[in-house]
Structures are given as structure tokens and as C-alpha cells.
């Protein structure tokens, strides 16, 4: 039980009227790290601990287990890069231009294929968005990032193509995000699946446009983990990645 505490006694405190809307926190968008949708793999710690299920989703910051299928309103897109070593994340480039350890990405050897072994540095497609069927407080969805890399790169290109060919804004559509199990000689893992669910309603479009103006180019995404994307060890005989 929570112990009963004494009331705070400050002159004039009883006359103060609390604001209806939150006060200015003094934080700019650059001070905020956007939570990320984690796709749980069979090797993920949260799966082995019984918290989540393989192929499921989780909020990377709060640990909230998310629905099996996500309805997302994407409001922008940007690319980043990440390289993992034996001890975890080794180098990170939030903008895909310059890494935190190895300098300019365009001059980095870790971007190249070597003897059919894929690049050690992975390209990440980031989609800041709102989950419309989860993570809602007081009727307002909270922003989060959907990140796709490695074996989900094909899905990212499909999503990018769908939006580019529609000649519409990211926030004009609501997409359904799910996962699919893949088995091959490299193991068992899950990849993202995406399809357009419907056109966004006017209030959703306004929310997406507002978020685009507020956040685009002014945010960092919570760090990826190596389990977020399955990394094939080498190309197949045909020279292609066995996705």
C-alpha cells in the first residue's frame, strides 16, 4: 500500500489553476529520440524471455507489446546506416552520409560486397509514423519510427514505390504492417510485409502534415539492434541475396 503523505503547504498554492494543455517543456525536437517499432526475431531476448512472440512488434522505448498487425500513418522518410560488431553497434550514421566512427559513408569499405559476403554496414529505411490502432493517449496517437533494413529492404523498396507512383504525400494513406516467416539455409526469421489499407481521413492527413512540419529532419531514431534484421552471410550462386 502507498503510504499517506502530508499535504504540501505553500502560501497561494490553493489558488493556482492548472493549465488545460501541457506547458512548454523547454525541449526542441532535436532533444527527442523517437521510439522505434521492434520486429521480434526468434533470437530476440524478449522472445526467449517469453515477453513477446517471434514475428511480433514491440515499442523499443516503453517495451509495450504492439498488435499483430499495425495500421500506420507515415509522415516522412529518411535513410540512415548502421554497422554491428561482435560487441553490438559499432558505427551509426543518422543521415547516411557520415558515420560516428568510420567517417564519410561514400568512402567507407564496409559498404562494399566482398567475395559474395554482404556489406557489414546496413542501409536503414526509416518511416516516422503514427500507429492508429495502438499507443494512443487521450485519443491522440503517439509518434514512433518504422525501420526496415537487411532482409526487409525489398519491402521498403515496395513501400517507397507505392508512394512515389501514387504522386501523393506519405500521410495521404494508411498502411497495414505485418510480418512473414521465412525459412532458408540461413535459418528462420521474419520480414516486414506492407499493403495499403485505405486512404487517410482528413483529420489523419492534417495530423500527418503537422507532424511532417514539426519533426521532419529534426529527430533521431532509437538505435537498431542486430536482431532487427536477419543478415544473410553471402550471395547465392546467381549473385543475388537470398531474401
Can you describe what each PLM-predicted range is?
Residues 1-139, 184-185, 197, 240-243:
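OB-fold ssDNA-binding interfaces and closely related basic DNA-contact patches used
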Residues 43, 95-96, 145, 149, ...:
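Intrinsic-disorder/low-complexity, polar/charged segments
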Residues 75, 84, 185-243:
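Long, highly charged low-complexity segments enriched in Glu/Asp and Lys/Arg with interspersed Ser/Thr
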Residues 86, 91, 121, 173-178, ...:
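Short glycine-rich, low-complexity/disordered patches
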Residues 123-199:
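Extended serine/threonine-enriched, polar tracts that run as long, contiguous segments within proteins
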Amino acid at each position: 500500500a502507498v503510504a499517506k503523505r502530508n499535504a504540501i503547504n505553500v502560501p497561494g498554492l490553493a489558488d493556482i489553476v492548472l493549465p488545460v494543455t501541457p506547458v512548454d517543456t523547454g525541449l526542441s525536437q532535436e532533444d527527442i529520440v523517437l521510439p522505434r517499432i521492434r520486429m521480434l526475431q526468434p533470437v530476440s531476448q524478449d522472445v526467449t524471455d517469453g515477453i513477446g512472440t517471434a514475428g511480433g512488434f514491440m515499442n523499443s522505448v516503453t517495451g509495450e507489446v504492439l498488435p499483430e498487425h499495425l495500421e500506420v500513418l507515415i509522415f516522412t522518410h529518411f535513410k540512415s546506416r548502421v554497422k554491428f560488431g561482435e560487441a553490438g553497434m559499432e558505427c551509426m550514421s543518422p543521415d547516411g552520409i557520415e558515420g560516428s566512427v568510420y567517417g564519410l559513408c561514400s568512402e567507407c569499405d564496409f559498404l562494399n560486397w566482398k567475395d559474395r559476403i554482404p556489406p557489414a554496414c546496413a542501409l536503414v529505411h526509416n518511416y516516422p509514423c503514427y500507429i492508429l490502432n495502438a499507443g494512443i493517449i487521450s485519443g491522440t496517437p503517439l509518434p514512433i519510427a518504422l525501420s526496415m533494413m537487411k532482409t526487409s529492404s525489398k519491402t521498403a523498396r515496395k513501400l517507397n514505390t507505392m508512394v512515389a507512383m501514387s504522386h501523393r504525400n506519405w500521410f495521404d494513406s494508411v498502411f497495414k504492417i505485418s510480418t512473414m516467416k521465412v525459412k532458408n539455409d540461413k535459418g528462420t526469421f521474419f520480414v516486414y510485409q506492407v499493403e495499403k489499407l485505405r486512404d487517410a481521413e482528413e483529420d489523419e492527413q492534417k495530423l500527418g502534415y503537422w507532424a511532417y512540419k514539426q519533426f521532419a529532419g529534426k529527430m533521431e531514431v532509437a538505435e537498431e539492434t542486430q536482431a532487427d534484421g536477419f543478415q544473410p552471410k553471402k550471395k547465392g550462386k546467381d549473385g543475388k541475396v537470398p531474401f
